[in-house]
Amino acid sequence: MQRYWRFQDNKIQDICFGVLGESWIQRPVMARYYSEGQSLQQDDSFIEGVSDQVLVAVVVSLALTATLLYALLRNVQQNIHPENQELVRVLREQFQTEQDVPAPARQQFYTEMYCPICLHQASFPVETNCGHLFCGSCIIAYWRYGSWLGAISCPICRQTVTLLLTVFGEDDQSQDVIRLRQDVNDYNRRFSGQPRSIMERIMDLPTLLRHAFREVFSVGGLFWMFRIRIMLCLMGAFFYLISPLDFVPEALFGILGFLDDFFVIFLLLIYISIMYREVITQRLTR
């Protein structure tokens, strides 16, 4: 006695019997058609023809790309925030009254980069942790003359400024430059150790990583132990990216398997920025 497989869908069963005949629909053949029918019934994706894994990967990639573009392009905006315009106006008037004596030629560090406070070419520029550039004397005056209870907010984006990074070199040893370095160190000593949220650390990534990698590949920059730690982090991220052993293996989850790779690399970049901030803090205590 022959045993036959029965479809749950009677229409599919009638079509198979009519085309092949019931004698041909034996167990191996029926098993194959049954599995194909079940796979078609279970293939219910959000968009027909595109798997849900691909959709999730595309959405996550677009979100990360949008965040990165926002972090990179926000520095293009150089207009003073409306809440800070009054303080900046007072500072500009004070700078104009102090310019009775001709000022020395300004040293150029950034091509066509102007300070948003004094509206002149940036002189001995200082960069905030949010990535905006100002004259060193302008941002210090903005801090001194403002009624701040703690760290200042950026005159442009209103983000809390917890770190000032000098962009000019150490060749100039004039009295004004020495006083400016002391003021910058004083500010960093007060506010660089403030607790930071995870979102604030992410927003600081482009600026801190740029300064960290610049010092890694410069002579007399960071000490060798910190350089070795950065190299180990980069090597660990590279080997994890090419390793077949993953928390979310690509063989099982397809494109979604790459998300954990990018997440690990992202965490390592945040760790490098935290280390660099600690190095700057240690310099202030020497």
Curated annotation (Swiss-Prot):
Q: Membrane spanning segments where?
A: 53-73, 230-250, 252-272
Membrane topology category: Multi-pass membrane protein
Cite the effect that the entry attributes to C130S: Loss of E3 ligase activity
Q: Which UniProt keywords apply?
A: Endoplasmic reticulum, Membrane, Metal-binding, Transferase, Transmembrane, Transmembrane helix, Ubl conjugation pathway, Zinc, Zinc-finger
Asked if the Swiss-Prot or TrEMBL record annotates the protein with the keyword Transcription regulation, the reply is: no
PROSITE patterns named in the record: ZF_RING_1, ZF_RING_2
Q: Which GO terms describe its biological process?
A: adult walking behavior; gene expression; innate immune response; proprioception; proteasomal protein catabolic process; proteasome-mediated ubiquitin-dependent protein catabolic process; protein catabolic process; protein K48-linked ubiquitination
ZnF RING-type residues are: 115-158
Please provide, alphabetically and separated by semicolons, the GO molecular function terms listed in this UniProt record. Answer: ubiquitin protein ligase activity; zinc ion binding
Task: Tell me which stretches of the chain form a coiled coil.
Answer: none
Q: From the UniProt record, list the reaction(s) this protein catalyses.
A: S-ubiquitinyl-[E2 ubiquitin-conjugating enzyme]-L-cysteine + [acceptor protein]-L-lysine = [E2 ubiquitin-conjugating enzyme]-L-cysteine + N(6)-ubiquitinyl-[acceptor protein]-L-lysine
Tell me which GO cellular component terms the UniProt record holds: endoplasmic reticulum membrane
Main EC class the enzyme belongs to: transferase
Places the protein is found:
Endoplasmic reticulum membrane
Which superkingdom is the protein from?
Eukaryota
- Identify the residue ranges that face the Lumenal compartment according to the record: 1-52, 251
Classification via InterPro entries: DUF1232 (IPR010652), RNF170 (IPR038896), Znf-RING_euk (IPR027370), Znf_RING (IPR001841), Znf_RING/FYVE/PHD (IPR013083), Znf_RING_CS (IPR017907)
Indicate whether Zinc appears among the record's keywords: yes
Q: Name one Pfam family in it.
A: DUF1232
SMART domains of this UniProt entry? RING
Functionally, this protein is described as follows: E3 ubiquitin-protein ligase that plays an essential role in stimulus-induced inositol 1,4,5-trisphosphate receptor type 1 (ITPR1) ubiquitination and degradation via the endoplasmic reticulum-associated degradation (ERAD) pathway. Also involved in ITPR1 turnover in resting cells. Selectively inhibits the TLR3-triggered innate immune response by promoting the 'Lys-48'-linked polyubiquitination and degradation of TLR3.
Subunit field text:
Constitutively associated with the ERLIN1/ERLIN 2 complex. Interacts with activated ITPR1.
According to UniProt, the name of this protein is E3 ubiquitin-protein ligase RNF170
Q: What is the lineage of its organism?
A: Eukaryota, Metazoa, Chordata, Craniata, Vertebrata
